[in-house]
């Protein structure tokens, strides 16, 4: 009798160690993946340094610019684009360039462009435009729903390269975005307008080999958005959490009671349905997002519950070890609840900081 009891205790201990290892491995893997992703993102965002010899552009025109983002009228991560309404103005000297007439939106299209004001006095020129544009933006949703993004608008001259036109940001403006900009579920911050060089990996078949027109001065401005609190997290996964909680109730049912397995299978279908709902909110990507991982953890938890129920049923019905089955259920219930809450808490802590 003592030997059988020791075997039963050994089975429970092995099961607890197994669940502990799964929890620790999953927690470490997810946190390492998040940290590696952020490190890689920082390297990717590092500005590319493009050197231009000033002697190669002795006759370029300096064009001073300013921007004011009025609103983001539409944002779709699923479709990888957004619409913006903004003001942009240019100041320059001379008649060699026409920045207001020739500018274009990189990776997007201008839907409307209206000249709001202009002043031309001798060589001094000023033009102000109101523009609405649609911009293509491949959103990186690796950390969804704890993701943040920069909604940037990039402006280039469609005719003149850096050798003829150079954008220079004005520093006289403190407010660069409308205080009425509101994107539900996100905090909004202003990004300082900058001018940078954009190199195209082609010479466009240019016959002028001495001055290759593949480097352009580029205006970059916009806003940064970050998730506002944990509201979206709980909204996305409340169905999943309820499904897991319902499955946990099965621990309090007798192993040979058929509805115990029905509860687990029903919870599994609910978790899978929630996963399809999450997939419908994300763009089609070739990697597993954080939301995918959270949902897969819930599905795995329910699957492990069904495995545990099968083992407990075998102990209870086939071996007649009702007391061992009861202890197995009791310890499993405590371990499942603690470990599932821990791994979700760990994900929130790592992803939100």
Label every model-predicted segment.
Residues 1-8, 323-327:
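Short, Lys/Arg-rich N-terminal segment immediately upstream of the first membrane anchor
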Residues 6, 13, 30, 331-334, ...:
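Alpha-helical hydrophobic membrane-insertion segments
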Residues 10-27:
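Hydrophobic membrane-insertion alpha-helices, especially the h-region
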Residues 11, 88, 204, 322, ...:
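Acidic, low-complexity intrinsically disordered regions
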Residues 26-220, 224:
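Soluble non-transmembrane domains of integral membrane proteins
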Residues 33-34, 278, 352-353:
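Membrane-helix interface motif
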Residues 220-339, 345:
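Channel- or pocket-lining gating/hinge segments that regulate access to a cavity or pore
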Residues 345-353:
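Juxtamembrane boundary at the C-terminal end of a transmembrane helix
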């Amino acid at each position: 009798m003592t030997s059988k009891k020791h075997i039963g205790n050994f089975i429970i201990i092995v099961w607890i160690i197994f669940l502990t290892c799964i929890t620790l491995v999953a927690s470490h893997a997810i946190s390492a993946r998040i940290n590696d992703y952020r490190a890689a993102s920082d390297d990717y965002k590092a500005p590319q340094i493009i050197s231009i010899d000033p002697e190669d552009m002795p006759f370029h025109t300096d064009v001073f610019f300013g921007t004011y983002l009025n609103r983001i009228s539409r944002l779709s991560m699923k479709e990888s684009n957004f619409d913006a309404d903004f003001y942009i103005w240019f100041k320059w000297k001379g008649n060699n360039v026409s920045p207001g007439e020739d500018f274009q939106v990189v990776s997007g299209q201008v839907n409307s462009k209206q000249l709001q004001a202009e002043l031309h006095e001798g060589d001094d020129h000023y033009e102000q435009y109101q523009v609405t544009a649609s911009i293509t933006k491949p959103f990186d949703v690796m950390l969804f729903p704890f993701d943040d993004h920069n909604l940037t608008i990039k402006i280039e001259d469609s005719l003149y390269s850096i050798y003829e036109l150079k954008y220079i940001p004005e520093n006289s403006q403190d407010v660069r975005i409308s205080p009425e900009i509101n994107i539900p579920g996100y905090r909004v911050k202003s990004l300082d307008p900058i001018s940078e060089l954009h190199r195209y990996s082609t010479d466009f078949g240019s016959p002028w080999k001495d001055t290759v027109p593949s480097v352009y001065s580029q205006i970059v401005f916009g806003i940064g958005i970050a998730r506002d609190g944990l509201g979206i997290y709980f909204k996305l996964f409340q169905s999943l959490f309820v499904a897991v909680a319902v499955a946990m109730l099965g621990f309090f049912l007798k192993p040979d009671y058929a509805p115990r397995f029905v509860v687990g299978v029903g919870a599994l279908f609910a978790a899978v349905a929630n996963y399809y709902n999450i997939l419908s909110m994300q763009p089609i990507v070739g990697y597993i997002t954080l939301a995918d991982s959270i949902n897969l953890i819930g599905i795995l938890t329910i699957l492990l519950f069904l495995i545990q129920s099968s083992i407990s049923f075998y102990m209870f019905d086939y071996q007649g070890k009702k007391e061992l089955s009861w202890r197995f259920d009791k310890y499993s219930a405590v371990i499942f609840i603690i470990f599932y809450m821990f791994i979700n808490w760990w994900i929130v802590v790592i992803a939100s900081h």
